[in-house]
Amino acid sequence: MAGYFTESNYENAVLQLLNEELGYNYIYGPDVERDYHSPLYEDVLLPSLQRINKSLPMDALTEAIYKLKNFETGTLLQKNMVFMDYLQNGVPVKYFDKGEERSTLVYLVDFKNPASNEFTVANQWTFIENSEKRPDVILFVNGLPLVIVELKSPSREETDASAAYRQLRNYMYEIPSMFIYNAVCVMSDLTTSKAGTITSGEDRFMEWKTTDGSYENTQHASFDTFFVGLFEKNR
């Protein structure tokens, strides 16, 4: 099977799976007018926060977005840890209501009702920081780039999932701000698909061999089992 897949074909197969089977909205990066120095999909971010936090005023939402875009100084790992706290527990903000200061949390994701969230898959999403890079595939939830996928050609002997891992590490150096918002990194060459975090060494990236709790009894799970099992919206 791998012999019939070029890297471009494989990328298209992954995009098609996420779009048609899992229901992610598909966008082609160059078609989106945006600031290439921002890793966020800002056209989706504010409407998503409004939808999830219906009772909060715009001042609270704009402060949350400001905090998402302006992290205090620290290492990439420290910033990622702050973001993960925001993602899981909400962004603490203050706003004024009838002259009285109030404190609240702005939630980034609706974990109780997945249908309230907007899931987007993009390719050719340019981001400029230390240099200009375009990761193969990015998965956004409510405009936040939570997943970065690096694919390698399954038909080229000189490239494999390890090459994808090295590319991910290069991205962390060249476009570190993209990884502030990262929850999962994926490296895949069709035969082998593994997921990890920004702190994972290559040996800590793990396969995912189930879509429903029943594991594939094979050395390597098929790529569709991996992506469906890991990125189905209810996960």
Each predicted region: which residue ranges?
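ATP-dependent helicase/translocase motor core
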Residues: A2-R235
